[in-house]
């Protein structure tokens, strides 16, 4: 965890050629009324995989198996780490309707019509769909 910056993890749950997005409720303080990946803040003393597992369990009721770090965005106030999750225990469902008012499996073609929390999500989903369920080259 980087002092002075918000440290956030998000899970990119991949099912076929789609990823799971949650629509943030319009009354949320941060990033209201946009589509976002499930995840949240890393707590003090917690590593990213533990934070990811906790947040995915809290928000969508799944326990990730073998998540892989995809990318990390670092800004002055925020560190955002995206983890690819291709396997999990449980069936995704909205466990925090006060945070997300809807969940949806979204393909790359569907992204252009959605307001996204982070513009990089478009590239992330396109890359994942391009690789399909195969590991990136070199793995």
Enumerate the predicted regions with their spans:
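Active-site-adjacent beta-strand/loop module that shapes the phosphate/pyrophosphate-binding cleft
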Residues: 71-93, 102-109, 124-129
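Conserved Nudix-box catalytic region and its N-terminal flanking loop in Nudix hydrolases
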Residues: 18-58
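Charged phosphate-binding loop/patch that engages nucleotide di/tri-phosphates or the phosphate backbone
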Residues: 117-139
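C-terminal structural segments of small proteins and small subunits
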Residues: 111-114
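Conserved N-terminal beta-strand and adjoining loop/helix that marks the start
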Residues: 1-20
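A short beta-loop-beta micro-motif enriched in histidine and acidic residues
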Residues: 8, 31, 76, 98-100
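A short coil-to-beta-strand element that immediately follows conserved catalytic motifs
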Residues: 62-72
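Short, charged/polar surface micro-motifs in flexible loops or helix N-caps
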Residues: 14-19, 26-28, 43, 76-77, ...
